[in-house]
């Protein structure tokens, strides 16, 4: 690659590091082109998977202020730049790595913080953002119903007591 081409590639990688919410470094040694295409498909629109040169990646990461890849840039390396939900991308990578052991998840960056491969796997075990928000809303709604019941219970109990007294007086008369 000529120097102007390298400078353009570094600038592009730097911009991808800055604009993505997460980046996951993988080793793809032993994967075929068809398998790499299947990996890109499994990641969907939430991530862009690119095979990159280690030296260019190191320079771009340094320019973007990322030092998480120190010592990780060796061998055939590819990066998944996550633009959408990091959980969905982590699930896609984890599932593909289970089916294809040749894919090795090395490390990553999430919101500017370094994460290990085990943390990426733990991230994949989380439910999606929408599911977590729905569960939180459901729990909040349940607490509101419980509070409403607690506020109305004394009044309804008083009404039932008065009705029971009326019936008792009506039976006595």
From Swiss-Prot:
What keywords are assigned to this protein? Ribonucleoprotein, Ribosomal protein, RNA-binding, rRNA-binding
Q: What's the superkingdom here?
A: Bacteria
Q: Name one Pfam family in it.
A: Ribosomal_L10
Q: Which residues cross the membrane?
A: none
Q: Which GO terms describe its cellular component?
A: large ribosomal subunit
> A Gene Ontology biological process annotation?
translation
**GO MF terms, alphabetically ordered:** large ribosomal subunit rRNA binding; structural constituent of ribosome
**InterPro entries in UniProt:** Ribosomal_uL10 (IPR001790), Ribosomal_uL10-like_sf (IPR043141), Ribosomal_uL10_bac (IPR022973), Ribosomal_uL10_bac_type (IPR047865), Ribosomal_uL10_CS_bac (IPR002363)
Record's SUPFAM superfamilies? Ribosomal protein L10-like
Into which family does the record put it?
Answer: Belongs to the universal ribosomal protein uL10 family.
Quaternary structure note: Part of the ribosomal stalk of the 50S ribosomal subunit. The N-terminus interacts with L11 and the large rRNA to form the base of the stalk. The C-terminus forms an elongated spine to which L12 dimers bind in a sequential fashion forming a multimeric L10(L12)X complex.
HAMAP family under this entry? Ribosomal_uL10 (MF_00362)
According to its UniProt entry, the function of this protein is described as:
Forms part of the ribosomal stalk, playing a central role in the interaction of the ribosome with GTP-bound translation factors.
Write the protein's name: Large ribosomal subunit protein uL10
Its gene is rplJ
């Amino acid at each position: 690659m000529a120097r102007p081409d390298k400078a353009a590639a570094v600038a592009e990688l730097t911009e991808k590091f800055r604009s993505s919410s997460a980046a996951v470094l993988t080793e793809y040694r032993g994967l075929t082109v068809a398998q790499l295409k299947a990996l890109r498909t499994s990641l969907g629109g939430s991530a862009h998977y690119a095979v990159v040169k280690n030296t260019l990646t190191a320079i771009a990461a340094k320019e973007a202020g990322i030092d998480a890849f120190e010592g990780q840039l060796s061998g055939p390396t590819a990066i998944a730049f996550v633009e959408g939900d990091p959980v969905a991308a982590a699930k896609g990578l984890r599932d593909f790595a289970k089916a294809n052991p040749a894919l090795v998840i090395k490390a990553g960056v999430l919101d500017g913080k370094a994460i290990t491969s085990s943390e990426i796997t733990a991230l994949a075990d989380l439910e999606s953002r929408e599911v977590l928000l729905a569960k939180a809303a459901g729990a909040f709604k349940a607490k509101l119903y419980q509070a409403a019941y607690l506020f109305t219970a004394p009044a309804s109990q008083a009404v039932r007591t008065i009705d029971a007294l009326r019936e008792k007086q009506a039976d006595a008369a």
